A protein has these predicted regions:
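Luminal/periplasmic active-site loops of membrane-embedded glycosylation enzymes
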Residues: 44-50, 152-166
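Alpha-helical transmembrane segments of multi-pass inner-membrane proteins
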Residues: 2-29, 40-110, 133-136
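A membrane-periplasm/extracellular boundary helix in multi-pass inner-membrane enzymes
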Residues: 18-20, 82, 86-87, 104-157, ...
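Glycine- and aromatic-enriched periplasmic loops at the membrane-periplasm interface
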Residues: 167-173, 183-186
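Generic structural signal for secondary-structure transition and capping sites
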Residues: 10, 179-182
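Juxtamembrane loop-helix boundary motifs flanking transmembrane segments in multi-pass membrane proteins
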Residues: 27-28, 165, 169
């Protein structure tokens, strides 16, 4: 099942690299970026790439039967993490890493002690890979990705809204629900 979910993500990565081979040429601010998302919505692409980050990490731990598959899965994990980060949409990437943390906790809880050493090694290497990908992403975006995750604009000023204005929408939708709890508004 993991492989069946991973194959379309591999095709998505190929398309994204064909659509936008150079990140430096298209990143100009800290907003979500349609160009680095293959021309699609950055939030949706980030979500599916976050799923890919999780899937390839799980493939590294559970489905790497030999060194060749381990290397292939690790390369795809690194590439999909990079492309997920440079969409400038934080939700999918953060969700992918939260799923990894949850999976690692479950694996550590349910595996025997001799298998735990492999999990620790993979987690350590994953952290090293992520730090390397983050540094490369920061270089490719001239530091704008650091500002995006720090909730700053391109000039380094803190943005007024941590949710890019969504809190107003959330508040109004919640108020409409409270005003019309039975029949709704439309």
């Amino acid at each position: 099942i993991i492989d069946m979910l991973a194959y379309p993500l591999m095709a998505t990565l190929v398309y994204m690299f064909a659509y936008t081979p150079s990140i430096k040429d298209v990143v100009t601010n800290t907003e979500s970026n349609f160009e680095t998302s293959g021309g699609f919505g950055p939030n949706q692409v980030s979500t599916i790439l976050g799923l890919g980050i999780f899937l390839f990490f799980v493939k590294i731990i559970l489905n790497s039967k030999n060194k060749k598959m381990l290397i292939i899965n690790a390369v795809f994990f690194i590439i999909i993490t990079f492309r997920g980060i440079v969409t400038f949409s934080r939700g999918g990437v953060i969700a992918g890493f939260l799923m990894i943390v949850f999976a690692v906790v479950l694996l550590l809880f349910y595996t025997k002690s001799q298998a735990k050493s492999k999990i620790y090694l993979v987690v350590f290497m994953g952290v090293v890979a992520f730090v390397g990908v983050w540094i490369y992403s920061s270089f490719q975006t001239s530091g704008l990705i650091d500002k995006r995750y720090a909730n700053e604009d391109a000039r380094g000023r803190e943005k007024a809204s941590k949710l890019t204005g969504r809190e107003v929408l959330i508040e109004s939708e919640f108020q409409m629900f409270l005003d019309n709890p039975i029949f709704g508004v439309g």
